[in-house]
């Protein structure tokens, strides 16, 4: 029976620590040296992998002790059996022998204990080495690397080949602190398995370095899962760093999200002040039992500080217990930088920042030529601040060494967490540059691009490279006959490429992004007039006929004919995107700081531009050219008369009423006049909070409506949120002054944006409104896991908990939170708010899981009144009765509605028959 069969039937036991057990043998320097000819000036004690060569009897004894204790899987003593790690001891030439002998020793012991009923397996241990591909060893030189992908690949390949020869059953890549190192190990493992003609399961085990829930190289668990999602992984788990109890929230997250078997082998608790581990088998076994009872795991074992006593205890508690059933991976494109990006339903469009492209930004090109990387990074940072969800990086210029510049800049980016948190788009026409770039990013990137231009063989090889390095891909609609310019050619090439990728390469459909070519219109050539419309039609066809695939394009190409007229260009882009997104375009390389939105365009201009973009009126291109010329002439006249065009526009909206000015400022993301207008509002409104609840909330609601209608995009919403924060900051001192001195605190409320969600503007407004009403507010920020909320709620003895979330996955996270609250014994009322939340969702999914009230809050202004009722014992009882009645009505209505929905088979029976 193979391990793939065994794991379906029961929970498997992995062995415990090797180093801890070795310490018990009190070995000396002489034991480590054995008969090897070694340098006298070096101390080899502690280089445990040497013992495979010098004291194999000790390693055999340890394996046998674990097998006797009940281990199903023993781990080879090869954690550091690779040249990179052994270089510290000048033993590079012995690394392969250590790996080979380590595998042979474990194989021998496993075979001794294997039976038909209980087969024993050998996991070949691959450690992370003592160096990292993703981080600089020198704080003064962030682009420097001690280790390259290629050198580590060579080192790991030698180790894996030796372990396969030695007879391992599984490859275990463990104690992962840098995802890029792990990707190299997976790549080397797959490569060596192909050479050897074997297919071994690959296990990954991550180390969370602190309570932030991130790896040492900065990735969240979500981001890590995205980074390795292209690989054939057998299991994913956690080891080292923490004890069992501290791993609980991270294990629950993995079990809920990872489409693999789940492993956990924690340390024997946290080390004490002497560096020793205080947990014993008796104290840790019950902790592990809870994970088994909750069906969170498939493989359990031990790391630092654990011994065969721990494993014997684990063997008893797994008997008769059901293993974890892996979840399915979402059929959506999921990317990552330091954080995960998931194209979920509420994200209608992914704006890819275009300014870090030497071909598209003269400033960026100049900075790269001048080696002014720090300022070049500010361009990247500004795009992220402006709402870019992905960053395009391109170094293709005849006067640049593109490969060197790409690698250097990407290494610089990885040192900037605020930039590195978003995924990257690797953009180059030189395939060697693309490969070099993929070898220095730990996240899941997008390659821009591949095509059939050089034929099918080249296309397949490039696609395999993309898959090998764990990326998604942009596919240009370009083949051996040239670039597709008509609708028919676009869909012909897309269909052919999709079939090759999914059927011949095995590329995940959701990781394919087609670029059907956005080409310039209004060029004076009639055959170009339909280019935009044909792109839109092609986008719609791709989404309907190529399941899972996405559509992207370089939007600025569309308006190339109007260089120098930014208003016309941005207006054309806004109109094009409005229609293309509705047709299915979900990615686009754009300037995230664009100022013109679809809603801003005057009706007369809008008709002309739509006629051109949609090619619906002959001669409309001439009308657009006339409009562009008039705008330029007006600008020239104003310059001659000493009038600034932009200032005249400002005067127009500045003459509106105070409320309209504030709404306009929010909608456009303009902070310039906020100080002036807020102080005028303070003279008009009796309380500072009334300014928030009045014109500012109205502005936010308008932005929400425009965003929902597709007339504003995420970068513009981000600017609005930033402007709202600025407005609240101006009002804050006045809010503090207006608090009634000496008045008793109305209550203590804890606010948090749930784990996985970085949006905080709504939560921040709630905090201000609650503070104005004399509530003490404890704001925990964004991406807050349940365990931290519980801990803070207990420490502060809060009266209310407010959970906020903007994105769809936050709905499930809120469900998880209240379940955790109940398990922790909390009976604190919970208020739920955020753009994707609803009273129906609370009634169906959240409220039934919690014993105390869970209340959906429509907007910030009603929070204080709801809170006051919840904290008044007399009023709370009646309120909860009415609330429960409301929830029961909602549930009953939903159930009745669901009963009216026929099954698919029944609906097919009722179909209209046109042939009788």
Segments (PLM) and residue ranges:
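Domain-level signal for soluble alpha/beta catalytic cores
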Residues: 1-916
């Amino acid at each position: 029976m193979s391990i793939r069969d065994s794991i379906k039937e029961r929970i498997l036991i992995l062995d415990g620590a090797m180093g801890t057990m070795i310490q018990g043998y009190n070995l000396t320097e002489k034991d480590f040296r054995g008969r090897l000819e070694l340098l006298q000036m070096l101390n080899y004690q502690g280089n445990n992998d040497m013992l495979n060569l010098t004291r194999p009897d000790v390693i055999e004894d340890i394996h046998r002790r674990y097998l006797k204790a009940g281990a199903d899987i023993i781990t080879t003593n090869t954690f550091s059996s690779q040249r990179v790690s052994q270089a510290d001891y000048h033993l590079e030439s012995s690394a392969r022998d250590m790996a080979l002998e380590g595998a042979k020793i474990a194989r021998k012991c496993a075979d001794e204990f294997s039976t038909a009923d209980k087969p024993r397996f050998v996991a070949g241990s691959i450690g992370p080495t003592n160096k990292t591909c993703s981080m600089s060893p020198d704080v003064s030189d962030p682009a420097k690397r001690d280790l390259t992908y290629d050198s580590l690949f060579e080192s790991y390949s030698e180790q894996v080949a030796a372990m396969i020869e030695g007879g391992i059953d599984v490859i275990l890549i463990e104690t992962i602190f840098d995802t890029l190192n792990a990707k190299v190990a997976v790549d080397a493992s797959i490569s060596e398995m192909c050479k050897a003609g074997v297919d071994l399961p690959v296990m990954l085990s991550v180390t969370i370095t602190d309570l932030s829930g991130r790896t040492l190289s900065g990735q969240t668990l979500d981001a890590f899962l995205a980074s390795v999602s292209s690989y054939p992984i057998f299991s994913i788990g956690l080891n080292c760093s923490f004890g069992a109890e501290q791993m609980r929230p991270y294990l629950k997250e993995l079990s809920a999200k990872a489409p693999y078997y789940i492993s956990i082998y924690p340390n024997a608790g946290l080390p004490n002040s002497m560096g020793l581990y205080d947990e014993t088998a008796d104290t840790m076994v019950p902790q592990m039992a809870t994970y088994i009872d909750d069906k969170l795991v498939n493989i359990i074992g031990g790391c630092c500080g654990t011994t065969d006593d721990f494993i014997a205890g684990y063997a008893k508690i797994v008997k008769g217990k059901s293993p974890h059933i892996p979840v399915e991976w979402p059929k959506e494109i999921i990317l990552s930088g330091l954080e995960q990006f998931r194209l979920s339903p509420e994200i209608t469009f992914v704006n890819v920042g275009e300014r870090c492209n030497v071909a598209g930004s003269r400033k960026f090109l100049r900075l790269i030529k001048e080696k002014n990387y720090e300022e070049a990074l500010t361009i990247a940072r500004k795009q992220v601040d402006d709402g870019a969800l992905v960053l395009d990086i391109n170094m293709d210029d005849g006067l640049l060494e593109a490969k060197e510049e790409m690698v250097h800049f990407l290494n610089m980016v990885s040192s900037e967490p605020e930039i590195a948190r978003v995924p990257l788009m690797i953009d180059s026409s030189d395939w060697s540059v693309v490969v070099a770039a993929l070898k220095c990013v730990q996240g899941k990137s997008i390659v821009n691009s591949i095509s059939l231009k050089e034929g099918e063989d080249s296309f397949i090889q490039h696609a395999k490279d993309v898959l090998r390095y764990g990326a998604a891909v942009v596919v240009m609609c370009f083949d051996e006959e040239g670039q597709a310019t008509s609708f028919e050619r676009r869909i012909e090439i897309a269909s052919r490429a999709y079939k090759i990728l999914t059927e011949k390469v095995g590329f995940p459909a959701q990781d394919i992004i087609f670029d059907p070519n956005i080409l310039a219109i209004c060029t004076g050539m009639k055959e170009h007039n339909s280019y935009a419309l044909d792109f839109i039609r092609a986008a719609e066809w791709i989404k309907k006929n190529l399941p899972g695939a996405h559509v992207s394009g370089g939007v600025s190409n569309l308006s190339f004919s109007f260089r120098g007229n930014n208003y016309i260009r941005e207006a054309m882009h806004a109109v094009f995107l409005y229609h293309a997104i509705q047709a299915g375009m979900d990615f686009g390389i754009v300037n995230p700081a664009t100022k013109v939105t679809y809603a801003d365009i005057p009706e007369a201009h809008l008709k002309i531009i739509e006629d051109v973009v949609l090619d619906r009126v002959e001669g409309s291109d001439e009308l657009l050219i006339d409009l562009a010329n008039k705008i330029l002439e007006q600008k020239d006249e104003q310059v001659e008369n000493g009038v600034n065009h932009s200032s005249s526009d400002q005067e127009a909206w500045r003459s509106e009423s105070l409320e309209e000015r504030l709404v306009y400022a929010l909608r456009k993301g303009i902070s310039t006049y906020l100080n002036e207008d807020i102080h005028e509002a303070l003279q008009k409104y009796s309380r500072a909070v009334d300014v928030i609840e009045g014109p500012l909330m109205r502005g936010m609601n308008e932005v929400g409506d425009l965003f929902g209608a597709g007339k504003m995009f995420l970068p513009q919403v981000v600017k609005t949120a930033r402007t709202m924060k600025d407005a609240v900051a101006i009002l804050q001192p006045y809010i503090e002054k207006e608090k009634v001195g000496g008045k008793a605190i109305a209550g203590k409320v804890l606010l948090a944006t749930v784990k996985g969600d970085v949006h905080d503007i709504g939560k921040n407004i709630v905090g201000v409104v609650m503070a104005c009403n004399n509530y003490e507010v404890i704001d925990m920020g964004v991406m807050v896991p349940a365990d931290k909320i519980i801990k803070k709620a207990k420490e502060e003895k809060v009266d209310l908990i407010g959970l906020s979330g903007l994105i769809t996955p936050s709905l499930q996270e809120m469900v998880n939170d209240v379940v955790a609250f109940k398990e922790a014994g909390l009976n604190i009322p919970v208020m739920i708010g955020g753009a994707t939340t609803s009273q129906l969702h609370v009634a169906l999914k959240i409220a039934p899981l919690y014993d105390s009230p869970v209340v959906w809050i429509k907007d910030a202004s009603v929070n204080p009144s709801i809170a006051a009722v919840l904290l008044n014992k007399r009023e709370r009882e009646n309120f909860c009765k009415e609330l429960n009645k409301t929830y029961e009505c909602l549930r009953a209505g939903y159930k009745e509605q669901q009963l009216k929905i026929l099954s698919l088979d029944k609906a097919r029976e009722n179909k209209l028959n046109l042939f009788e």
